[in-house]
Amino acid sequence: MLPYIVLVLGCWSVLSQAAQTDDEERAGNRRPIWIMGHMVNAIGQIDEFVNLGANSIETDVSFDDNANPEYTYHGIPCDCGRNCKKYENFNDFLKGLRSATTPGNSKYQEKLVLVVFDLKTGSLYDNQANDAGKKLAKNLLQHYWNNGNNGGRAYIVLSIPDLNHYPLIKGFKDQLTKDGHPELMDKVGHDFSGNDDIGDVGKAYKKAGITGHIWQSDGITNCLPRGLSRVNAAVANRDSANGFINKVYYWTVDKRSTTRDALDAGVDGIMTNYPDVITDVLNEAAYKKKFRVATYDENPWVTFKK
């Protein structure tokens, strides 16, 4: 009887290891997806969107006349079906976000791993962009990263709508270096969100001295239709040997059909007002084998080619 039990246990161990290896291989071959909760501008919305399935959020940042980040505010017009006027003081939002992304905090949301700051620099003159970057860095360092002492752990994407505002990137980096925390740039990525020609976007990054950590967005309000031609161009750049893009995301996607189209195109992120819709599609048999929700272990700056 004993040899039989040993044989059974041995077979079970082999099968378990094989199953684990199979799971790991399936996970490794599936594209990690960032489900980006759109227009999360009030602290209470952080939990709301994460609980619906978002593993990342997008937050609007408005600036005052002196290039100080002021509010997490979008304003009218915004997406159809949304309240455009919710907001917080920027630094208050950062503190709430820090609580949600700091392990051990009572408000901690483990699934929230990336934050896109949609920087509303349209109110600024071009010559204020560098200063805006410096002031943004100081605010994040103090109120989100807690001056480098057990601050929030989420990765950050600085999304800039105007290619001419590329000096914001240098100002941000220079300020973190001046304040003694250049290592925090490891947690920071970049995006130009103005739907510009991909070639022009690449030129802006060259001017900014940036290689790597690049997300490329494409999209339009959910009130209007938009094709995937530019998404396809961004994905082609990402997958090419000499491309500069690491990740591609599409906004604002609220329909299952559009979600499927975006996934089929090979995007890495989908920005949405309804994270549960994206989650539902990812759980469909045809997509569950190809995609998975990204976790904190995923490096959002690493390219996953189609």
Curated annotation (Swiss-Prot):
Cofactor notes: Binds 1 Mg(2+) ion per subunit.
Effect of residue 38 to A: Loss of catalytic activity on sphingomyelin. Loss of catalytic activity on sphingomyelin and lysophosphatidylcholine, and loss of hemolytic, vascular permeability, nephrotoxic, and dermonecrotic activities
Activity regulation statement: Catalytic activity and hemolysis are inhibited by divalent ion chelators (1,10-phenanthroline, EDTA, and EGTA).
Catalytic activity: an N-(acyl)-sphingosylphosphocholine = an N-(acyl)-sphingosyl-1,3-cyclic phosphate + choline; an N-(acyl)-sphingosylphosphoethanolamine = an N-(acyl)-sphingosyl-1,3-cyclic phosphate + ethanolamine; a 1-acyl-sn-glycero-3-phosphocholine = a 1-acyl-sn-glycero-2,3-cyclic phosphate + choline; a 1-acyl-sn-glycero-3-phosphoethanolamine = a 1-acyl-sn-glycero-2,3-cyclic phosphate + ethanolamine
Protein source organism: Loxosceles intermedia
Protein name as it appears in the record: Dermonecrotic toxin LiSicTox-alphaIA1a
Residues engaged in binding Mg(2+): 58, 60, 118
Lineage of producing organism: Eukaryota, Metazoa, Ecdysozoa, Arthropoda, Chelicerata
GO cellular component, one term: extracellular region
Cofactor: Mg(2+)
